[in-house]
Amino acid sequence: MSTVCLSMIVKNETHIIHECLESMWNKIDYWVIVDTGSTDGTQELIKKFFADKGIPGELHERPWVGFGVNRSEALALCDGKADYAWMIDADDKIEGDFRYPNNKNLVADGYALKCGRDQCIWWRNQIFKTGIGWKYTGILHEYANCDKQPIHQEKIEGNYHLEARTLGNRNVNITQVEKYTKDAEMLLQALETDPTNSRYQFYLAQSYFDSQQWDKATEAYYKRVEMGGWEEECYYSLFRVALVAMSQQKDWAIIQQKLLDAYDYRPCRAEPLHIIARSLRMMGRVRAACMFAKQAAQIPHPPQDILFIDTNVYRWMALDEVGSTAFYTHEYQTGYAVCAKLLKENLLPPSEIERVRKNLEAYTQKLQEIEAANRAAQQAQAEAVKLQTPASPTESKSSYIPPRAARFKQRK
């Protein structure tokens, strides 16, 4: 069985680190934590926590240089202490049922974990084989690379995620706009000396987006796309350009075209089509909405993608758009099937169950009305044949329900 050493860099984390350590202590055999200048008692909290748990380890104190340098130093200090090092931020924590593969008999050089925030997931290397030269690169949004080449990397699947909370010391006493404005300034300066660094360019655009500098974000995203390279990052840049246009309340025709640009770039991603479907439905354009919703619902969760995937779109939201619009296109059987699937397979969050149940009832009633009308028509036709007189058409007594009908519920 492989041994695992917890690896962290910390500074003034007493307000948040206990939750992280509680989620990690039963998954490790040793710990090596580097403090970069805490003045709030973080060091004592860490030592007491692990002493109470009976887990050996060591605390080092080092001056702050930068994320890449300090993380690399923390990883190097794990060499010889365990077979693997698990790097985690003080404000992150493991949620769910995490299990090591192969009963903790680890074989890969590195393992990517499923990270999440709100509806979004992404995969990131967090567990590294020690002694083979893993290092972090970058001033912000740093990433791990390895001296050993080629390397064997795997994902650890399962019903868990690493909750990325952005609640650490870097987020204290500062607004999100201020934080990401500072990040943008740092990345812009870094790009002056390394202008071909596509990762810096992408996170410059992200920082502009998160600091609500919309025009700069659009320009930076398009520049990232022009640089080429990783297709997922280019796709997401185009997708965010569309979200910027939505934030700026631009004309729908412009927004829709930008969403279609993102979809055309990476048609295995359903998020752009889902937004189009939902937006059209809210405009009352239910037939067009249903068309886009059905296309989005046909796209499975992309198993090969690792960057910023809205899992709810693939789990239930695209299907729900079909269920919310098929009634108005007279595709009652389709709407019934979708609502039944959402309920039967427990795909919905609790807040949506009653609404979808009412929609299923509306579809059921409509299908029963159609079936009754068909039976009546068939019976009338049979009677007419007996009398050897021409059959007269029978109209359904049910009427078209307009989009604002009270008995059919749409998601807001």
PLM-predicted stretches and their roles:
Residues 23, 27, 34-46, 63-64:
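A conserved acidic beta->alpha catalytic loop
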Residues 211, 248-249, 283, 329, ...:
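Structural motif corresponding to the intra-repeat A-B loop/turn of tetratricopeptide repeats
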Residues 208, 245-246, 280, 326, ...:
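Residue at a conserved register position within TPR or TPR-like alpha-solenoid repeats
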Residues 7-30:
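Short, well-formed alpha-helical segments that are part of the catalytic scaffolds
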Residues 203, 240, 275, 282, ...:
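"A position-specific structural signal for the A-helix of alpha-solenoid helical repeats
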Residues 68-75, 82, 86-88, 92-219, ...:
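Catalytic-site signature of metal-activated, phosphate-bearing donor transferases
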Residues 44-73, 77:
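Conserved donor nucleotide-binding strand/loop of the catalytic core
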